[in-house]
Every structure is written in C-alpha cells, then in structure tokens.
C-alpha cells in the first residue's frame, strides 16, 4: 500500500475491542488512513470530533469503528428496550445511508450489534419490521427517521453515539431543521459521543458543532490539492452540436472500465442515456426521478461491473463509495464549484489514479473561471478535430423504450455495439494559458 494513502498506524495498536478488530481484519483493514489515524485516538478517549475530510479518505470506517467500539465499551441505559437505538448515523441521501450500512456489515457480523436503515423511497412497513426486530445502530436520512419517531416506533432517550456525515451537504439540501429536531430529543451532548464529518468546516458547520456537541476537537485532513493529485484533468471547448459526438468518441478512445457521466439536468441525463444505450453501451441512469429500488439496482450493477457507464445528476456526486471508477466525464460544467470537486472525486480514490474530462460548451463555459479559481489551477485544455468524431451514430433511445444494455453481450459482442475501436485521435493537445494573478 502507498504511504501517501495509508499511515503506519495499525488498527490493532489502537486498543479496540477484539470483536471490532476482528471485523476490520476480515475485510483486510490493517493500517489507518490519515483521517482514521487522527480521529480514532481522539474518539476512543470519548472526546467528540468535528472532522474535515474529502470523500474517499476513509472517514466512514473511522466513525463506524468508533461507534461500534463505543457501544461495546459503554453499558447501555438501564431499562432500554431492544427497539430503542443506542446510536444514530445521519446521512444527507438514501444512497449514502445504504452505503454506510453496507460498509458496516463486517462489524455487524463480528460484534453482534444490530443495525437498521430508515430512509424515504422504500416501503415504510418493511423498514418498520426491521426496527421492531431490534436495533442498536440506526442509519438513515433525517426525514424518515423523524417519521418513525413521530409514530413512536422508537425514542431517542437511549442514544449514546451520534454521527452526522456530510454535514455541509445537509445544509445544502435544507435538512438543518430536521437535524436540530433530532438533536434536541437526544440526551445532552456530554452524555453521548458526537462525530461530525464534512468536506468543509464552514462557519455554519462549526456553529452546528458548537451548538450540539461537547467541546469537539477539530480534525482536519487537507488534500494536497482540492482535486487530488492522482486525477488527470482535461478540458475541451466543444460546440453544442459536437458535444454528444465528442463524448462518444472519447468513450471509444478511452475505453473506460467504469465511468460516470455528469450532466446538470435530469432531461440532459436522459438524452445522454438514450444516445449511449442506442449505441449498445451497458449504461445506467441515476437521477432524482428514478425510483429508489431501481436506483439501488443500478448502483449494484455498476459496482459489480454489470454496467460500465453511469449517467447521473449531482445526486450521485456526494458520498457514494463506488470503487474503481476510472473516468469521470463532465458533459456539463457544474454551476457550483464544489460540485466539480465532488464529481471528479468519484475517480482517483483510495490511492488509485483517475481521469476527468470536462466540456466547456456554449451554455456552461461561463462556469469555468470560478471553478478554476476555486481549485487554484487552470485545467489543461485539449483541442479536438471535428472530422475525427464518430459520425455513424444511431438515433437515441427514448426513456419509454426497453433498455437492452448490450455493451457487452453473452454472444461476444463488443463494448460499443457492432463498431470496434477505430483508433480515432480527436485530441490536439495544447498548453493552457497561464493563470492571471
């Protein structure tokens, strides 16, 4: 393992409960990442923390390890019923909640503690049945957690550990009132272990920590640069007319093992999906309108390698832990500078390298200057040869049409339908202009 990603701190030397160490070792976790090495020694003394770390740094394992260990070392409240959670982990999106639950699986197995999910978009009754079976750790989104609370499925009187993940995103999505509602129904901050993690410790996030935590210690892991030194960035200036052909030509040239294509609107994502699906790619669509069960299935297929391309809005840009994403395509430059960082942060994770390709088109080139100012460097620019772009593209599929997803077929078909890689070279690299000081 590379020392740039893994420290010399061993989990086995932290004084964790044997059941916790066993769960970590079974998943191959021996050495801590920087955020784990900084946060865990503090948390294991019972001290609250407010941690700043980008996604992909191992913060999920940090707070899961601390939560499970705390529950094993702290006696539960006298008279607690099995349906009353002892710990609560709040996430901004259901996808992130599900991912946290999945990441907790080895610790659930090794410790015997019970975890349950609560998030919108899935059957209330199914989640209710799981909760009624008993729960030690409740993982979910604030809206559904409040629904269960108001229906008196559980109370929060026995909470001994609290995690607020992606706190800055919670603010962005307008969940701060829900968070405060839940905090005010828990025991006093000094009576529980509190963990807050955020990509940025902005003033509003620090204010939340001050209000609902007990003298939290600030733990900061700054990336060497906002976009990650293992991510190769590249920028094109296509016309609106050339964008789709350029995307498909670059996909053919790059031949990514696993790639995410981001666009700014649901309708644009559907259009991109239609073009790629018609061309025979195994492609999934992830937007806010896709039903929850479908979203989960698509993410599972993408993670297992059954889908090679994922077209998504920014709903998938934060918090999801999808391994081995080799490429990110920004079909549209995002309106929010932080979204650019979070999008391309889907690749180049856990010490791996990645490639980010962005289009500064007629509609969204205006977003480039603030993005480059935010990331503190100019994105290298490549020209392209319009005559080298793919021309023989089929008509796009419509959303009502069946999704054949035939990028790789059992009959030995190629990854892009009947067209084999042609070795096109649309790029004409050029030096980016020096940034004005």
Swiss-Prot record:
Residues 245-390 form the Helicase C-terminal domain. GO terms for molecular function: ATP binding; ATP hydrolysis activity; RNA binding; RNA helicase activity. InterPro entries: DEAD/DEAH_box_helicase_dom, DEAD_box_RNA_helicase, Helicase_ATP-bd, Helicase_C-like, P-loop_NTPase, RNA-helicase_DEAD-box_CS, RNA_helicase_ATP-dep_RhlB, RNA_helicase_DEAD_Q_motif. GO terms for biological process: RNA catabolic process. It comes from Vibrio campbellii (strain ATCC BAA-1116). Residues 403-413 have a biased composition (Low complexity). Residues 417-428 have a biased composition (Basic residues). This is ATP-dependent RNA helicase RhlB. One of its GO terms (cellular component) is cytosol.
């Amino acid at each position: 393992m590379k020392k740039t990603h893994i420290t010399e701190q061993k989990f086995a030397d932290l004084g964790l409960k044997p059941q916790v160490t066993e769960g970590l070792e079974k998943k191959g976790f021996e050495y801590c990442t920087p955020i784990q090495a900084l946060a865990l020694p503090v948390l294991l003394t019972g001290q609250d923390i407010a941690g700043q770390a980008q996604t992909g740094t191992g913060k999920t394992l940090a707070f899961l390890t601390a939560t499970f260990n705390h529950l094993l070392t702290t006696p539960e409240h006298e008279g607690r019923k099995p349906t009353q959670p002892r710990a609560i982990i709040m996430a901004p999106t259901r996808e992130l909640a599900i991912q946290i639950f999945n990441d907790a699986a080895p610790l659930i197995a090794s410790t015997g503690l019970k975890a349950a999910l609560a998030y919108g978009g899935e059957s209330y009754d199914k989640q209710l049945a799981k909760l009624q079976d008993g729960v030690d750790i409740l993982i979910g989104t604030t809206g559904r957690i409040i629904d269960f609370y108001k229906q008196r499925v559980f109370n929060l009187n026995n909470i001994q550990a609290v995690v607020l993940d992606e706190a800055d995103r919670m603010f962005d999505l307008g969940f701060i009132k829900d968070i405060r509602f839940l905090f005010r129904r828990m025991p006093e901050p000094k009576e529980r272990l509190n963990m807050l993690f955020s990509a940025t410790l902005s003033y509003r996030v620090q204010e939340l920590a001050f209000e609902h935590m007990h003298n939290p210690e600030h733990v900061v892991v700054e990336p060497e640069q906002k976009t990650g030194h293992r991510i190769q960035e590249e920028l094109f200036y296509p016309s609106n007319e050339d964008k789709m052909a350029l995307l498909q030509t670059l996909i053919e040239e790059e031949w990514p093992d696993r790639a995410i294509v981001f666009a700014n609107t649901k309708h644009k994502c559907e259009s991109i999906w239609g073009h790629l699906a018609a061309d025979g790619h195994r492609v999934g669509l992830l937007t806010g309108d896709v039903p929850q069960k479908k979203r989960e299935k698509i993410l599972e297929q993408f993670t297992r390698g059954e889908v090679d391309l994922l077209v998504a809005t920014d709903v998938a840009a934060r918090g999801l832990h999808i391994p081995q994403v080799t490429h990110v395509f920004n079909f549209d430059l995002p309106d929010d500078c932080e979204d650019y960082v979070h999008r391309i942060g889907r690749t180049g994770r856990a010490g791996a390298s990645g490639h980010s390709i962005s289009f500064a088109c007629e509609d969204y080139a205006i977003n480039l200057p603030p993005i480059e100012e935010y990331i503190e460097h100019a994105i290298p620019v490549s020209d392209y040869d319009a005559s080298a772009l793919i021309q023989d593209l089929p008509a796009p599929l419509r959303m009502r049409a069946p999704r054949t997803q035939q990028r790789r077929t059992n009959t030995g078909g190629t990854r892009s339908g009947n067209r084999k890689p042609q070795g096109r070279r649309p790029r004409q690299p050029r030096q980016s202009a020096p940034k004005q000081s």
